[in-house]
Amino acid sequence: YRRTAKGRYVCIKTVKSGTTSYVDKTVKSGNRYYYCVKAYNGNVLSGYTEASILYIKAPVVTVRKSAQGVKLSWKKSAGAKKYIVYRKTPTGKYRAVKTVTAKTLSWTDKTAKKGQTYYYIVKAVNNKTYSAASPQKRIKR
C-alpha cells in the first residue's frame, strides 16, 4: 500500500507468498511517499508497519574544462539537502571527491591533472536517501 502526505492508502501491488521486496517505479521526484505492507494468509489480513520515503531524482550534470580544472554543474534535485561528486579514472573505481550543500549547484575539480581522462557522477542526498547516480560524464583535461 502507498499514500502521499494528504492521501489515503491505496494497494499498489499484490505479490506472491515468499516475496520480500518490491520496487515502486511510479514515484515522482520531490514527493514523499508512505508505504505499508500487510500479510494475508487467505483468511486474515494482518496489521501493518509504516515507512516513509522521499524520492530524489538523479541530478542532470554537465562538465567542461576550465582554467582551474574540470567544472561540473548540475540542476537542482527536488528534496536534496546535499550533493556528492564522485570521480574515477578509466582504470579506477568511483570515489567521493566532494560533498556540497543543496544551494551549491557547481564545483570545480582543481586536482584534475592535464592530459588525464576522468569520469564523474553526482548523487543527490536527503538525510539517508540517495538518488540514483547521474549519467556518467567523461572528460579529458
Model-flagged regions — what are they?
Residues 19-21, 32, 67-71, 104-106, ...:
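A generic structural signal for beta-strand entry/edge sites
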Residues 12-17, 39, 63, 72, ...:
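Intrinsic disorder/low-complexity segments, especially N-terminal tails and targeting/processing regions
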